[in-house]
Structure formats: C-alpha cells, structure tokens
C-alpha cells in the first residue's frame, strides 16, 4: 500500500508552553477547524479530547503528551500536545526529540513565564524550529509588543511578527496578515470562528502594518544574500519569495515567526494552521538521520529520510492502555514498517514483533497496515522496548541518539492499605516506571519501605492516583523527602590493599587512586595503569567497585556525584587475585578517599516566580527569605509585581497553602528546577542527625 500523503507534505509539530497559556485549547481548536472534531470542546469543562486521562480532565492540565493526526490544505499534521507543568518535563523532552517543529504558545497577558523558558531551552537542545502563537489576545492586559520583546530579551531569540493584532482585550477582532497585507476579521456572530472576512487594511492601522512589514522583510533578507541584493536594489520581493525565505530562516533557527489570536474565542487558528504548513519543516527538510553501529559505537551511520531506506525508528513513549495493553509510541526516521513484521531492538539486541499498528487520535485509535518514514504511530506487542530504544531492520542495524532525562528530586514512602495489595502495588509501580523514565521505584534497605521518586509533589500525587484508578491499589503515602546528594570539595590520594587468607584460595586486590571533584560530570573513571601492574581484565572490576560505592555517600548515605577517579597504580597476586577482590578494593578506596576529601551535602534548588498585588509584596519577600530563598529580581507587569527567587526544595513543601493565606488567594507562583547547591553547615548537621549518621 503506497503512502497517501507525500513526505514533503507531512508536518510533525509539538504544541508547547507554560501551564495555562492555552495549549490544549489551541490544539482542540486545530482539531475542530481541520474537521477531526465535530463539536468544540473546552478544557475547563473537562471535555478536551487531548486531555484524556481522568486526572487531566479533573485538574484541567495536560500530564501526558497526547499524539493526534489531522489534515489541512492537503498536508498531514501530526500534533503532540505537551504538558506545561514543571513536574512533567519528561513528556516535553521526549516529544521534542521526535518532532521536526514546535508551536510555542504564550499568554499575551503574561509573556514569557518560567516554564516557557525551560521548554524553550529543551527545544534549543534538539535544534527544533519554532513559531510563536500569542494566545489570549482578548484578555485584559494582553500586550502583543511586550510579548515580542520578552522573547527577544528572556529567550535570546529573533521573533519576527508576520501578523499584527487588530485591537486587544474585548476589542480584539482579528489580525493583519503582513504577507498578503490584508485584514482577517472574525465577525461577532461568526459560526464558532469557522468563517472570517478578508478586507483591506483600515486607515488607522496602515502605518503600523507598513512599519512591521518592513521589519519583517529586513529580517528575512538578512538571512538570504540573493534576496538582500534584490531588496536593497529597490526591487519588489514577491509573496512566494517572502514565504520561501521565511520558511528557510525558520528551519535554520534564525527567525521565529510570530502570529496571534485567541483560541478560546475562536480567532486566529486558521492563520496559525497556514503558518504551520508554510513555515514548519517537513521531515525531508531536516538533516539526514545520524546513528551509531550497535557492534562498534564509534562508527557513525548516516541514514536517508526516505521510504526506500532501511527501517529505523525511535520509541519515545510507552504506556499501558486499558483495552490493548502495552502501547509503544514511535517515530519512523527512515524506511517503513508493516504490522506483523519482526524488527530488531538494536539498543537491547533483541528481536521484537510488531503486533497491531495504531494511529492515535488522543486516546481513540485507528488500525493501520503500514507506517512510513516521518510518521508517528503506536505499536501493540513490543515486550522489551522502553523509552529511547531504537527499532530497526534486522539486516541494517543502527542505534539512534538516545534521550536524556533528569534525575528525580523528591521521594515519598508508599505502602498498600491492605497486606493483600503488596504484590499488586509492586506490579502497578513497575508498569508506571516503565512508562515514565523520571519516575523511580526502590526498596529502602534499612526500613524495607517502598520509596517512589519523581519530579515534584504533583508528579507523585498523580502516580498514587493512577495506582488507585488503573490498578485498584489504595496506598498510604509518607511525608515528602528531598533527593539530597553528596560530593567532595578537594582531591585525595588513597591506597587500599585488600588481602584475605582463610584456608584455601585467598583474596588479593591492591589499588592506588586519586579522587577529585568533577563538577557537573556525575562520574568519570580514568585508567592510568601501565606495565601491567594490574592485569587489564581486573580494571573494569575496580571501576564497578567505585560505582557501587557512589550509591551511598559517606556523610548521610546519599548518592555521591560529580567525582573523578584516576586509577594509577597497584599490584596483584598470581593465585589470589580475582575480579571480586579488585571490586572490593576499588569500593573501599573510594569510600576512604571520600571521607578525607572534605565531603558536603548538595540540595536541589528551584527557581521560583511569584506574581502578586503590590500590597502583599513585603510579606511574600519576607516569607521567601525565611525559606532560605535568594530574591534575584522584581519587575512590574500589568499592575502586579513579579518576584524571582531561588529557594531550596526542602523549604517549599506546603508553599501553595502559605502563599494563598498571605495574599488572600490573589498571588500565584510557578517554579522549575534550577541546580544542586551545597547546604549550609547547620542544615548538613541536621540532615546527618535525621539520618542517624
């Protein structure tokens, strides 16, 4: 069966933003105007198609990235609606990895908010081309120009308006299209925004439109020498040349086109769809896919993005579906695959059989026979494939670049309400951990408790909620615990001779290491053994011993991070030496060195942004200071004060309630993980006492 829509007419885009900027509503409108939805649905009524989990509909926020497909002007658009809440960063990260472009939705009232910055940085990491949609133009305080300068200043990008708004707040009627130089106006009685009028630009907007168009043209020609020559030579630049130049500059990440509207009031969405089709890349616009040879990871393999190349795909999400079981979402980067085919999971070196293949529309599904290059689909029946694994043709193995996920920052102990549910809880937690790489489960060796860790209180709340709804396991949850870490502040030279003789064969391992701080590098092991003083086959055992010793630090038993170990000398015994002996020697050497290397405890610190009426500002700043917060800035916006601070996570529990009472419910806050920093000596002592160390 041949593909229905050619690859160059396909767009894979994500809708990304800060929580509450109106992402899901924007996506719902896109589905309505492209004919997928028969009736408009509202997020605040809990009806949104893309928010299909019960918890999402209750809370009115998006937790998982729902994938859906729609069609516009002969193009196929695969859309992923990503969460905006900081606790679900992993969903954004894995979506961006498999997309070709992204629509960044901003609230025209609030501009760039903390989570917008986080998501923007994630998109920078994967070099994802973007266009900006300023939503909520009908709301009080909407300010188009402020949003443009916010993107420039806070995100360091080059926003170029290709529209300007007609009116704002309750006077917002539509937009001026700066390429066509026409007004697009949605009448008040328009049939749910489906019909609009295209008119000549009114006199009072002419000057502003000409001025902004000139800026748009100058920005485009700066990226193209031939156009620049033509433009400054006084020649007219055609509409086709503008679109082509803008498309190239967007794909090259030198320009971010800006459009605006109000999704809730049904204005501006059709023009946004035109911009997606005109300026977002097709899979063919993106460079060749690069991967590595599974047998020799140093060898790079280039793979052409075409249906004729060998099959290669990346699994970017695993989830359990109540009807079909385990679903694996994947993006095809080259070739095609049909249902029932056997493919190779090159990350794990295992063969997998593609059972049914489903095209997802939020949580509705349509069975399909084939998936072609550039498409996103979900497979049933992949038993061993996890997020980030590569699936490929058996005769052309390749491993695509994997995704990196942040480590959890918060933990709680959970136990089932009834003893009978112990086993069910174990199964539920392991299934949920399979779906979400930032959710970890472990058993505390000292207490025997089950500890779950994640990206924030909301993240873990939803996990506990899902256990109850999907797996019928009710649980008691302990107090939140912060994921502290340990590190060292100076270098140390350490020698350990591990020798054991108790009749028969003994144990002998002798190592000399240097342990030194290695900020931001987690763990690094360097082998400087020469002349075979330690045989080559024992070196990995020393590294393994060091790695195991890192799991429990020397101050309070938290993981030891950001260290470098150099193995430079030692000795062995012909008969008594073994891998086990060298592993124990490596572990002992690292522990002893860490004790002498001035160890310290690190704590997760969050960037917090509080928006408050001025009269509560003093109390709120005082409260942040009392939480060991460092206030770094204050600005005015729309009559409110915005306070920025860095606050340790351990001081943020219960903050939402305190903030409500201090501001009579009028202040709001958002936060995102910033970094790990050393705790003060008094806090370190307190942590040690609590841990009984």
From Swiss-Prot:
Q: Where is the protein found, in the record's own terms? A: Cytoplasm
This protein's record includes keyword Cytoplasm: yes
InterPro entries for this protein? EFG_II, EFG_III, EFG_III/V, EFG_IV, EFG_V, EFG_V-like, EFTu-like_2, G_TR_CS
UniProt xrefs under CDD domains: EF-G, EFG_III, EFG_mtEFG1_IV, EFG_mtEFG_C, EFG_mtEFG_II
- The keyword RNA-binding appears for this protein: no
UniProt superkingdom = Bacteria
Which positions in this protein are listed as binding GTP?
Answer: 17-24, 81-85, 135-138
Q: Share an example GO biological-process annotation for this protein.
A: ribosome disassembly
* Protein keywords: Cytoplasm, Elongation factor, GTP-binding, Nucleotide-binding, Protein biosynthesis
* tr-type G domain mapped to chain residues: 8-284
Q: Name one Pfam family in it.
A: GTP_EFTU_D2
Cellular component GO terms held in the UniProt record: cytoplasm
Q: Which Gene Ontology molecular-function terms are recorded?
A: GTP binding; GTPase activity; translation elongation factor activity
Which Gene3D superfamilies does the protein's record reference? 3.30.230.10, 3.30.70.240, Elongation Factor G (Translational Gtpase), domain 3 (3.30.70.870), P-loop containing nucleotide triphosphate hydrolases (3.40.50.300), Translation factors (2.40.30.10)
| Family as reported in the entry's similarity comment | Belongs to the TRAFAC class translation factor GTPase superfamily. Classic translation factor GTPase family. EF-G/EF-2 subfamily.
Q: NCBIfam families from the entry? A: EF-G (TIGR00484), PRK12740.1-3 (NF009379), PRK12740.1-5 (NF009381), small_GTP (TIGR00231)
Summarizing the function annotation, the protein's role is: Catalyzes the GTP-dependent ribosomal translocation step during translation elongation. During this step, the ribosome changes from the pre-translocational (PRE) to the post-translocational (POST) state as the newly formed A-site-bound peptidyl-tRNA and P-site-bound deacylated tRNA move to the P and E sites, respectively. Catalyzes the coordinated movement of the two tRNA molecules, the mRNA and conformational changes in the ribosome.
UniProt-listed HAMAP family: EF_G_EF_2_B
Q: What is the protein name stated in its UniProt record?
A: Elongation factor G
